[in-house]
């Protein structure tokens, strides 16, 4: 015998009778049906739809929906049907199945001995969506419309995941059976629908975490909707939610979330709180589980707390006596300078000379000029040829100053005095007759000899041949066709000195001096008297013979 069947035995017999005084009978629900935990089954499943449990039903003590008719005792009739959850409460397409069930509703006679009635073996059978209209039409045909909702007020859509039980009672009256006002139960939700299913939480992979929060937990549960579920942590005076996204809900049966931080993040001892699932849409909650918040294990020596105290102490010290670099407007300081040792400029290097270092330059009166041009090397001075513009046709005739400067650079590397003061050639040549000499005379002596009237071949000398205007840059035809006076050309150092000595002898044109010995080549090696002078490597005639051998063959012999 079920516990619900024992209820009439504990009730007084007079409750089934109508109380004197004319009180109106009414129906009261003693045991509400359980809202969640029952599954609506289809007819095609071929099995029983089960039994609707009572609200206080447990695994050890099962209960069922129970009603009581107040202020009445006697025969009567009772009907239980399904209506929609929301008003107006019209007939629902689903139907009740079980003992004494027909056309989708339950109907039975009331026992005259008792006024409390329990409904066992009542199950809910759902219909397919394509059969909704036919099922509703069957309810209207069988007069299964407790609230007489007209067709136009009934909605075209039905909530197939929720129903209500409607209890209708008819009692005997003076004119026969009189209906009592119908009574509705609380909604019953299909356990298959995630939006209405019963929430149930299972122990996860861990039931404790740090008081700082952020620990990852895998939680198992029944079917839930990922957009309509939360993990709630709560204690007395405190509540927080676990953090997770919709993508962290795996197939509606598992949730991966991170724990929220506890209200006291510096715990010294563990604290136990509650953890549960909550559905925001209907505020439905699951049975809670225990969760323990532990002291933070990452800072066993309380280093962060000590560092905070040190930081606060330093900040207070800086506020009392700010450092120089932390002042609001520090005084400007001059830029820092770095001493770099200075080095003397490198001495200019003289180009190598062909005959060695030249003698010291001679300055008249011992005073050097203000600015002096850089002397040309001796090799370039000896090989430089001067040509007349009219003869060579390559440029203007060189000036006397340029020729004199080049000659003096070749002799001593010095620069002549523009005033025409005599040069001390006696000290240079080691001969007293040449102590003083005029610059004009020196120019004439160093210049080429005059061309004889007969032409080039009349003189018969090699020095005369060197006085020809020669320009290696011009074509040979222009050079060979024109002869005449030309600018002086530098000769080699030994031959120029030899000509100077010959002019200063008693038989020479520049005479006046004492007789001297036979002329010698001062620049070349010594040779016996009477022997012809030997050409040297530095003599210009030897170089001229090599350079002009091909050039002289182009001139016609006169």
UniProtKB/Swiss-Prot annotation:
A motif (Nuclear localization signal) lies at residues 306-309. SUPFAM superfamilies: E set domains, p53-like transcription factors. It holds the Pfam family RHD_DNA_bind. One of its GO terms (biological process) is positive regulation of transcription by RNA polymerase II. GO terms for cellular component: cytoplasm; NF-kappaB p50/p65 complex; nucleus. Residues 524-558 are annotated as: Transcriptional activation domain 2. Residues 385-444 are annotated as: Transcriptional activation domain 1. Keywords: Activator, Cytoplasm, DNA-binding, Nucleus, Phosphoprotein, Transcription, Transcription regulation. It is found in: Nucleus; Cytoplasm. Residues 317-376, 388-544 are annotated as: Disordered. Residues 454-463 have a biased composition (Gly residues). Residues 342-351, 358-376, 526-535 have a biased composition (Pro residues). The keyword DNA-binding applies. Its main location: nucleus. Residues 25-311 form the RHD domain. Residues 418-433 have a biased composition (Low complexity). Spleen; lower level in brain. The modification Phosphoserine is found at residue 281. A motif (9aaTAD) lies at residues 542-558. GO terms for molecular function: DNA binding; DNA-binding transcription factor activity, RNA polymerase II-specific; RNA polymerase II cis-regulatory region sequence-specific DNA binding. NF-kappa-B is a pleiotropic transcription factor present in almost all cell types and is the endpoint of a series of signal transduction events that are initiated by a vast array of stimuli related to many biological processes such as inflammation, immunity, differentiation, cell growth, tumorigenesis and apoptosis. NF-kappa-B is a homo- or heterodimeric complex formed by the Rel-like domain-containing proteins. Component of the NF-kappa-B p65-p50 complex. Component of the NF-kappa-B p65-c-Rel complex. Component of the NF-kappa-B p65-p105 complex. The transcriptional activation domain 1/TA1 and the transcriptional activation domain 2/TA2 have direct transcriptional activation properties. The 9aaTAD motif found within the transcriptional activation domain 2 is a conserved motif present in a large number of transcription factors that is required for their transcriptional transactivation activity. This is Transcription factor p65. The gene is RELA.
